[in-house]
Swiss-Prot record:
The gene is ctaA. This is Heme A synthase. Catalyzes the conversion of heme O to heme A by two successive hydroxylations of the methyl group at C8. The first hydroxylation forms heme I, the second hydroxylation results in an unstable dihydroxymethyl group, which spontaneously dehydrates, resulting in the formyl group of heme A. Its main location: membrane. Its EC number is 1.17.99.9.
């Protein structure tokens, strides 16, 4: 009987070790996905800031992987661009060589987006077929893959808004595209953190997890507002801080009718709300840090609250500097990168309060 018990216990240990190896492999894979998503979002930001997003006027998911390879193909691509309002109203003097500059940004963004399907889908299929993914993860991970496919359609829906009557894309569709990318990013971060070892330390207060969730949602809302700012070029509305052209509440916030539309289409109002959102997020993160340090200063949870505060502080400094310098490309992209880092850490911090993802039990030890 002792030998049987020893054998059963060893089998359990072997199974736990196998699950540990599998979870580590999945964490590494999701980490690579997160890095690729991070790069994709930044290239997308550069595409918007350089006004390159309308340079490719067709959606060809397969054939579009291959860029123009000779002078004739470049001219054909340029001729397609000449048909849209952006060229006719803003870029009538553009040459083929200048067109190549904006084309490559949009092509790179689409190429990375297609590559994401391979980076996510192929390893997922391998992990499922070889039994490395626990069954209860099949549905959520498959859902992330499908959301990635939907994101491709949303991207074209966004681009198509600027091909007929506009010289740029709709800020509503731009915000939808960016928020969807962030939801994919958050989902990957959530499950990577869930499959990681967790501290057994109790939360500093009974409200800590809810506060962490609030911070994550506020971070996402700030990214949404930032997309509206980018879509409307609202960063150029006021380039002073802390006042907005000498006023705490500037004029011109409600010049459109109906009044609610100013929150989405008035560049001055959109920048104003983005500032207020930043102040609110900073305040909540600061309060969260103070509460955590007072309640349980030596815990991992408290240390995470300090890191989160520092990240938000850096992001605030980046945002102010970007504003004061009138939105230079390198600072605007750094600010966007900072937003994604803050959001990603906020998601990881939130998930850290719920412990490691329950393990799949397949072996029982008998007395």
């Amino acid at each position: 009987m002792a030998v049987a018990n020893l054998t059963s216990e060893q089998a359990v240990l072997n199974e736990v070790a196998r699950q540990d190896r599998n979870r580590r492999a999945i964490r590494i894979w999701l980490g690579c996905v997160l890095l690729a998503l991070f790069a994709l979002v930044l290239v997308g930001g550069a595409t918007r800031l350089t006004e390159s997003g309308l340079s490719i006027t067709q959606w060809q998911p397969i054939h579009g992987v291959i860029p123009p390879l000779n002078a004739q193909e470049w001219q054909e691509e340029f001729d397609l661009y000449k048909r849209i309002p952006q060229f006719q109203l803003l870029n009538k003097d553009m040459t083929v060589d200048e067109f190549k500059g904006i084309f490559w940004w949009e092509w790179a963004h689409r190429f990375l987006a297609r590559a994401m399907g391979v980076i996510f889908g192929v390893p997922l299929l391998f992990f499922v077929l070889t039994g490395r993914v626990e069954r209860k993860l099949w549905l959520p991970l498959g859902g992330i893959f499908l959301l990635g496919g939907l994101q491709g359609a949303i991207g074209w829906w966004m681009v198509s808004s600027g091909l007929q009557a506009r010289t740029d894309v709709s800020q509503y569709r731009l915000a939808t595209h960016l928020v969807t990318a962030c939801l994919i990013f958050a989902s990957c971060m959530w499950f990577m953190r869930a499959l990681s070892p967790h501290s057994n330390e109790p939360a500093p207060t009974r409200y800590s997890a809810k506060l962490a969730g609030l911070i994550a949602f506020m971070s996402l809302f700030q990214i949404y507002l930032g997309a509206l700012v980018a879509g409307l070029d609202a960063g150029m509305s006021y380039n002073t801080w802390p006042l907005m052209d000498g006023a705490v509440v500037p004029g011109g916030l409600f010049v459109q009718s109906p009044g609610w539309i100013n929150f989405f289409e008035n560049p001055k109002m959109v920048q104003y709300v983005h500032r207020l959102g930043a102040y609110a997020l900073f305040a909540v993160v600061a309060v969260n840090m103070i509460i955590s340090l007072r309640a349980a200063a030596e815990t991992t949870h408290a240390r995470r609250s300090v890191v989160l505060f520092v990240l938000v502080l850096i992001q605030a400094i980046l945002g102010i500097t970007t504003l004061l310098l009138q939105v230079p490309l390198h600072l605007a992209l750094t600010h966007q990168a900072g937003a994604l880092i803050v959001f990603g850490f906020a998601i990881a911090n939130w998930r850290g309060f719920y412990g490691e993802y329950p393990r799949q039990t397949v072996i029982a030890v008998r007395d």
